[in-house]
Amino acid sequence: MQVRAALTKRLSLIATKDGFIYTQSPVLDSGFADIAAGLKYNLYRDAACGRLLSVGATFEIPTGSNRSLQGNGNGEFHFFTSAGTRVGSRSHWLIGSGLREPADDNLENRVFYLSNHFDRQLGDRPLYAFTELNWYNYGSSAAAFPLPVEGGDLFNLGSPGITGNDLVTHAIGMKAKPRRNVEAGVAWEYPMTARQGLMDNRLTADLIVRF
């Protein structure tokens, strides 16, 4: 679950990670996720052209369940930037990149990522098809996890022997916008690289409500 609240016209308080992890994976159990929160600042916004640029930072507190591979380490700083533009009258391109920097690099891994999202409206209906491409590059190894396994976007395992490794995933999905303040979507994601980390494939459903 994520929560975002505007503090000013440009500055927002964001809670980007919390809630409960439900999994059928043989290597972990269901449990609570860590909590991450911080600030996001809008550097540029042009509503007429559909363009925006933002930067932000969060800190992840290791409060989650160990059985869900959460609650490890001494916390993680996340520094990021995101941008978006309207393409023509029916499409949007969004890009985000960031650095996940552990408070203790012996317990968690340093990760750089780059994510791209492209969507297109289907006719005049409030329905959008989209595709996403995500790249994770591991900048450090650690000694907290027994195996050289990458954790992707949800986990920071503190794995050994993964410095320089890359994980690339691709997702396709659909999103509906029945009202101006409501969005609902579903996506199927799978790894494209030989190294898969903890991901075989993943089905994600989301619901966004704006107040």
Pin down the residues of each PLM region.
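Outer membrane beta-barrel transmembrane domains
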Residues: 117-210
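Detector for outer-membrane/organellar transmembrane beta-barrel domains
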Residues: 72-155
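Residues that define the transmembrane beta-barrel architecture of outer-membrane proteins
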Residues: 1, 30-35, 51, 71-77, ...
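Glycine- and aromatic-enriched membrane insertion/assembly motifs of diderm outer-membrane
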Residues: 1-24, 30, 34-36, 108-113, ...
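Repeated loop/turn-to-beta-strand initiation elements of outer-membrane beta-barrel proteins
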Residues: 10-15, 46-50, 89-94, 124-129, ...
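Transmembrane beta-strands of outer-membrane beta-barrel pores
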Residues: 17-23, 43, 59-65, 99-103, ...
